[in-house]
Structures are given as C-alpha cells and as structure tokens.
From Swiss-Prot:
Taxonomy of the source species: Archaea, Thermoproteota, Thermoprotei, Sulfolobales, Sulfolobaceae
Family to which this protein belongs: Belongs to the sugar phosphate cyclases superfamily. Dehydroquinate synthase family.
Compartment list: Cytoplasm
Gene designation: aroB
Pfam family, one: DHQS_C
Function: Catalyzes the conversion of 3-deoxy-D-arabino-heptulosonate 7-phosphate (DAHP) to dehydroquinate (DHQ).
Major location (coarse): cytoplasm
InterPro entries for the chain: Dehydroquinate_synthase, DHQ_synth_AroB, DHQ_synth_fam, DHQS/DOIS_N, DHQS_C
Residues that hold Zn(2+) according to the record: 173, 237, 253
The protein's name: 3-dehydroquinate synthase
Organism annotation: Sulfurisphaera tokodaii (strain DSM 16993 / JCM 10545 / NBRC 100140 / 7)
Gene Ontology MF annotations: 3-dehydroquinate synthase activity; metal ion binding; nucleotide binding
C-alpha cells in the first residue's frame, strides 16, 4: 500500500493507494458521515468501515449534475444536522465526485470531503485536483469550485471486476502523464503492458501512485489555473473534448483523449515545437494499450461542425488564441498560444 501526504494551502491531503486501502476509513468510526454513491455501485464494502452514517444514492447520468439536484443534496445534509466537523464521502466515478465535491464545498462554506473513486480513470484523474462542477442552463460545468478533499482512497479491489475496456479508458490519462510529465512512467508503461492488462496488483499500484504524484505536483504549483502550469493536464483534451461534443458524448472520454493526443502531437511537430519522433512515440504507446489513434477507429459519427464549435467555446480560449500544452519530448512540454483559426484548421483535418 502507498500513502501520499501533501499540503495544499495549509490543508493536509492524503492519498491512500492499494488493496485494502478502505481501511483508512477506520479513523471515521466516531465521526458523522454522509455516504453519497452511484446507484451502479454496491456501497457495502465502504459501509463496513463506517459506524454513524446516512447513505444517499446518486442518480445516474448528467441529471445528477443539474444545479437543482445538487441543491437537493445540500438540503439532505441540512435536514440531517450535518456541521463542518462532519464528513461527506463521494463513492463512484467522475460525475459523483463532481457533484458531491460541489455540494461539500458550498455547504457551510466547506465540509470535510473524502473521494473514493471506483474506476481507474477516477483514481488517476477525476478524484484528484479539487475541481468540482455542476451544469446550469444546459451548459456543462458552468458552475463549480476548487475544493480539495481531505483524503482520496484508491482501493484496488474496485478494479478486480472492472472490464478491460474500462481499464483502457483510464490508461489514456495515465499515458498522458507519461508523455508530457514523466518519462519514467512512460518507460514503465512501455515495459509492463502484460502485467497491467492482467491487473497485476504491484503494476496497478505503481501506475496509480505515479499518476497521482504527477497530477498533484501540477495542482500544487497552479491549483486555480492562474499560472499557466495546470494547462499541461489538458494535453489531448482540446481535440478530445471536441470529439466528445461532436459525437453527442457517445465516445468515451478516454478514447476521445487518446485520439486528441495523437492529433495534438502531430500539430506540435508540424509547427516545430516537438522533437522529431515524438508523434511515433505517442502513437506507439497508445497502440500498445489498444487505444484508438484516429477518428475512424472510434466507430462513431462525429458532427464536425459541432466539434469545431466546441473548440471556439473552450475555456482555454483567450483573445483569439487557445492555450495548449505541446509535448516537446517524452516527459516534457511547452505552453503555446495557438491562433484559434489555426487550431480549427488542424482540427478539421483530424476530424474528417
């Protein structure tokens, strides 16, 4: 088991990684807890570690992120007499951590939050970083806060029954860290595909640990995205989000990001920021893990107009330019402000 202890803005944050990591909940035995969980998940494994708690299932899908639904969750905390010394647990995937994190951040200006992701994607990305968000007027994540959990528990037991396809979707984000932040992680991935696909305990623990440390190092340096550092976490996401939007969100996030990383690496090489061979390194590692490289391989209809429109509305747009992290070599990156018309041209080539 690995434990990462970090300090962010005078707040202590612990990340517990490994089989049996849920044992970290024992310290809540004497605490009052609200357990929010996805309806798709059996919460009994978590409940066995708690004593005084209420359980609140979260509806599936984007409806859970509606602001009115979030306020209903706030009301449940209020009606059950929760105060700032009590705890909220978010058990599930990105939707659950998004909405429950938002609720925790606004209730009494902040109540203790523990994230327990149940997918590889959640363990290496969604549960880390403190971003929360709910939808408003049919716009995704237009309301949100930066609010750090006191603890993140990544228990590998949740991954035992996860289909390999779900593991692959999470691996896209792991590969991202290796490509732009961590050559050691890239090398580890290059040598350990069989172990990772076999869900070897030590291999999964290693990639989750390295990914968690990589992401948290970026978050510590630029928690609120004001210094242009946290932008590195968006490698592959500008084109990737456009693909998601153009498919009416039928393409899974991990697959969209995989194609997005290929497109953005090609762009970086073509405009002269990436060393020769970077695109080959990107495509090789993604293909090793059986991730899609092109839009055609997604087996989904992409509305190019809708995808391009999503790029123009990207939150990274500033004064006609899009802030993008380009890989310069494996494990390194550079921020480049790309004219939006240039980006749209590259994107159209990639999406057709």
């Amino acid at each position: 088991m690995r434990i990462v202890n970090e300090n962010l803005c005078n707040n202590e944050i612990s990340i517990v990684i490994g089989k049996g990591a849920l044992s970290a909940l024992e310290e809540l035995k004497d605490k009052k807890v609200a357990l929010f969980y996805s309806q798709k998940i059996d919460p009994s494994r978590v409940k066995s570690h708690l004593k005084s708690f209420i359980e609140i299932p979260i509806i599936d899908g984007e409806g859970a992120k509606d602001i009115q639904y979030a306020l209903k969750l706030v009301k449940l905390l209020f009606e059950n007499g929760f105060d700032r010394g009590d705890y909220v647990i978010a058990l599930g995937g990105g939707t659950v951590t998004d909405v429950v994190g938002f609720v925790a951040s606004i209730y009494m200006r902040g109540i203790n939050l523990i994230n327990i992701p149940t997918t590889l994607l959640g363990m290496v990305d969604a549960a880390i970083g403190g971003k929360t968000g709910v939808n408003f007027e049919n716009v995704k994540n237009v309301l949100g806060t930066f609010y750090q959990p006191t603890m993140i528990i990544s228990d590998l037991n949740f991954l035992e029954t996860l289909p390999l396809e779900e593991i692959k979707k999470g691996l896209a984000e792991v590969i991202k860290y290796g490509l732009v932040l961590d050559k050691d992680l890239y090398d580890y991935l290059a040598m350990n595909k069989e172990k990772i696909f076999a869900k070897d305990e030590s291999a999964l623990e290693e990639i989750i640990y390295k990914s968690s440390v990589d992401k948290f190092s970026v978050v510590k340096a630029d928690e609120r995205e004001t210094k242009g550092i946290r932008i590195v976490l968006n490698f592959g996401h500008t084109i990737g989000h456009a693909i998601e939007a153009g498919s009416n969100f039928t393409v899974p996030h991990g697959y969209a990001i995989s194609v997005g990383m290929v497109c953005e690496a090609k762009m970086a090489e073509e405009v002269g920021y990436a060393e020769e061979g970077v695109v080959e390194d990107v495509t090789w590692i993604l293909s090793q893990y059986e991730l899609p490289l092109t839009v055609d391989s997604l087996n989904a209809k992409i509305d190019v107009k809708k995808a391009i429109d999503a790029i123009t509305k990207d939150k990274k747009v500033r004064g006609g330019y899009v802030m993008m992290p380009f890989p310069t070599r494996i494990g390194d990156w550079k921020r480049v402000d790309v004219p939006i018309e240039t980006l749209k041209g590259f994107a159209e080539q990639c999406l057709r």
